[in-house]
Structure formats: structure tokens, C-alpha cells
A protein has these predicted regions:
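Residue-level preference for the first positions of well-ordered beta-strands
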Residues: 53-57, 135-138
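Conserved GTP-binding G-domain of TRAFAC-class P-loop NTPases and closely related GTPase folds
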Residues: 55-59, 64, 76-81, 87, ...
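Conserved substrate/cofactor phosphate-moiety recognition/catalytic segment
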Residues: 68, 73-133, 174-176
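Conserved nucleotide-binding/hydrolysis micro-motifs of P-loop NTPases
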Residues: 97-99, 143-144, 169-174, 226-227
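Conserved phosphate-donor/acceptor-positioning beta-strand/loop module used by diverse small-molecule
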Residues: 159-178
Length: 237
């Protein structure tokens, strides 16, 4: 069984070779306000800075480290039932919150039977947060399904928010190890499909130079080493 990473970090992983950047390396800066596609894999940056009304999606295949990233920068834990408010008033939405809430009523059913309900509740919470709050909304999503990217982008535009993505790019073996470490494993076939769609998405962004969805203001591609060196994600007026 793989060893667990130190709490709050994503240690010990080399930058992914799955989708090598074709752009010139980003200059080493302490603060970046993303406004386009930024490939920061293997880079060094202290702070990402977004508008206070941003919709920020933290994306990656299962086990990539999305929940750990949310905990590291926003103090969000996935073992609570309701969304947490992080620094700068950000509301943080993780699908595991819906799973914990529903488990009390549906514990007697095998999880695959009520997984669609979890995703429905999660997306209802995303819609409500984008509609009803004025501060930043941070969203946990794999981004490997086009319909989820389109839906979130549509809602963000509908409620006057800029959509930004942080994409955690890690090798499949590392993501699989992350699933074992957290104790939540994805079916092997489903995981393989996630990886295939992720690779296509990375090609779209890095080689075809297209955004993952129309209307996305920025895309930041990072690996675990980059995340570990970052100190904060800020939202400013």
C-alpha cells in the first residue's frame, strides 16, 4: 500500500510527463493573476490571485489531490456535510460533502446506486452558490466530463462571474496511489476513462491551444511539486 503524503501537502511526485508543455516556461514570479493559459508544471510561484467574484474550479482525475489542495489553501475538509467558508469569504464546494450528508439516510444501499444523487446534490449546491453569494466560489470537479464544464461555465456567465480553472496534472499511477491513501478507490474501468478524457483535455489546452470551455477566463496547469511550493490562493476586489 502506498505511503500517505504529509498532511496538507502533495509531496514526492515529479512533474507529469503525460502532457509536456509546448509553451516557453512561465517566468518565475511571486504573484500571478491568471488571465490566459499558464503552464506552471515544475514552476515556482508563491501566490495565485483571482477576482473576488470568481468561480474557481480545482480539477484533476480522482486521486490527483483536489481535496488536499482545497484543504491546503482554503482550510476545507471533505468530512463535513455543509460547504465551508475559506479565506477571503470563499465558499468551498466538494462533492464529498453531499456524500456524507446523504450517507445518513442511504447508508444501507450500495454507493454506486446513489452516486447519481450525490452528483445531483453537489451541482445543485454549485448553482445555488453561484447564484446567491457575492464572494468567490471554489468548486471541486474532475473536469473530465464535458457536460460538467459546460454547465459550470454557463452558470458562471449567467450570474456575471469569471470562470477560472486550476488543473492538477499528475501521472495516473500517482493518482491511483492517492485513491488508496485516502481510502476511496474508483472502479478501474471508470478511472481509465477519466485518464483518457483528461489526456484529451490536456492536448486540447497545451497543443491545440484551446480553452476547455468557452468563456473560461484562465487555465492554470500545475503539478504536485508546484502546488507544494505555493503559499496561497487569494481573492481580491
Amino acid at each position: 500500500m502506498p505511503k500517505e503524503s504529509r498532511l496538507g501537502t502533495l509531496d514526492g511526485v515529479k512533474p507529469s510527463l503525460e502532457a509536456p508543455p509546448i509553451h516557453a516556461p512561465e517566468p518565475l514570479v511571486s504573484t500571478l493573476a491568471p488571465d490566459s493559459v499558464h503552464d506552471l508544471r515544475g514552476g515556482l510561484i508563491e501566490e495565485l490571485r483571482y477576482p473576488n467574484s470568481a468561480a474557481l474550479v480545482v480539477a484533476g482525475v480522482p486521486g490527483a489531490g483536489k481535496s488536499t489542495t482545497l484543504r491546503r489553501f482554503f482550510g476545507a475538509t471533505s468530512n463535513i456535510e455543509t460547504p465551508r467558508h475559506g479565506p477571503d469569504g470563499a465558499i468551498v464546494l466538494d462533492s464529498h460533502q453531499a456524500r456524507i450528508s446523504l450517507r445518513r439516510r442511504l447508508w444501507w444501499l450500495p454507493y454506486p446506486l446513489w452516486r447519481p444523487v450525490v452528483h445531483t446534490v453537489h451541482f445543485l449546491a454549485i448553482h445555488a452558490a453561484l447564484r446567491d453569494t457575492t464572494g468567490p466560489v471554489v468548486i471541486h470537479d474532475c473536469a473530465t466530463f464535458r457536460w460538467t464544464r459546460v454547465l459550470i461555465a454557463h452558470w458562471a456567465a449567467l450570474y456575471g462571474r469569471d470562470l477560472h480553472l486550476i488543473m492538477l496534472d499528475v501521472p495516473p499511477t500517482v493518482a491511483r496511489a492517492g485513491q488508496y491513501a485516502r481510502g476511496r478507490r474508483v472502479n478501474g474501468v471508470a478511472f481509465t476513462l477519466h485518464v483518457r478524457r483528461w489526456r484529451r483535455l490536456m492536448r486540447t489546452i497545451t497543443i491545440e491551444r484551446r480553452r476547455p470551455t468557452d468563456g473560461s477566463r484562465s487555465v492554470v496547469i500545475v503539478d504536485r511539486a508546484t502546488v507544494n511550493r505555493m503559499r496561497r490562493v487569494k481573492f481580491v476586489a
